[in-house]
Amino acid sequence: ASANECAYAVAEHVGGTIENFVAMMNEKAKELGCQNTHFANPHGLHDENHYTCCYDMALIARAAYQNETFRIIVGTARYTIPPTNKHSEQTDLQNHNEMLYPFQTNKYVYDGCTGGKTGYTNAANSTLVTYAEREGMTLICVVMNTQSPNQWLDSRNLFDYCFDNFQLFNIAENETNYTSAEQKSVGTLNTNEPFVDIDKDAGIVLPKTAEFSDATSKIIYDDVTNDTVGT
């Protein structure tokens, strides 16, 4: 179901060799902040030198979710491959993440699920990475070393707890202690875009028992030594 042969093909296409691609995987994991991860192959089948943890996998999943094509693929419930010159009949594919699509039963379909990936080996047992979104807040849930159907049940319970007890605040819409610093226009060619601004997409997650005003803020300045701020 995981098309391991495709993982090999992609690895050779991108990295030139399997070994080079695995090195790229480990470098990317390090770049993302993973501290308990080491890859030994591109497909994830068991290897003593191939390991990760829930937190590191969440870091990787968060980075992957920034890619629009990835979001489309993991969020697709069903897909039909039309006939090709290699296969005369169409091929119907179903997503095996039962929180997204009722592959075998509809008991585990989760409201707000936007995709994810299942996994299983004899050594790792069932694993699952799932994305879910409600009221503008997207969560990533990672469960490992479970026995089916607990990968679905544990993920649902974790999602329910977070959605029931936490909420996302848009900082720019709620911040009252700071505002944008506008540039003064000099001449007709200059713009009035702010040179100091609050990211309009930045958010903070707080307990539902808290208000945005309960949070404290701190300005951390970039190191601008020798930077030119005006001429």
Describe each region flagged by the PLM.
Residues 34, 49-51, 55-56, 61-231:
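Domain-terminus/edge residues, biased toward the C-terminal soluble/receptor-binding domains
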Residues 1-80:
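Active-site-adjacent helix/loop patches that line small-molecule binding or acyl-intermediate pockets
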